[in-house]
Amino acid sequence: MTKKKIVYIDMDGVLVNLGDEITRWFAAHPHLKEKFKDCPDHITGLFRFPKPFEGALNAVKKLQESGKYELFIATSSPWGNPEALTDKRYWLEYWFGETFHKKMVTTHR
């Protein structure tokens, strides 16, 4: 039996279109723009509902269906936004179901 290669997939900027979500937040909540202009990742709730990049879901599906890879998520969670990690976990479940269940690695680098 061939051992599957391990692949770590980043969330922000790879799967998750966080740039568009930040723009949407600042448009909907202009009072937040000045406070969070240098650290928008500290906005509570920012990581819960962003859209995935076009093609991201299909790319993960193809990797999974190939049977060649053990897929994991590698992401970071800003210290100034402790809810972000929970939001990211919910985001993964919403878009991928059980694909990344207990397969989320958090780092700050």
Name the predicted role of every residue range:
Residues 2-3, 66-67, 98:
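Glycine-rich phosphate-binding loop signature in dinucleotide/nucleotide-binding domains
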Residues 82-109:
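C-terminal cap/substrate-recognition subdomain and adjoining C-terminal extension
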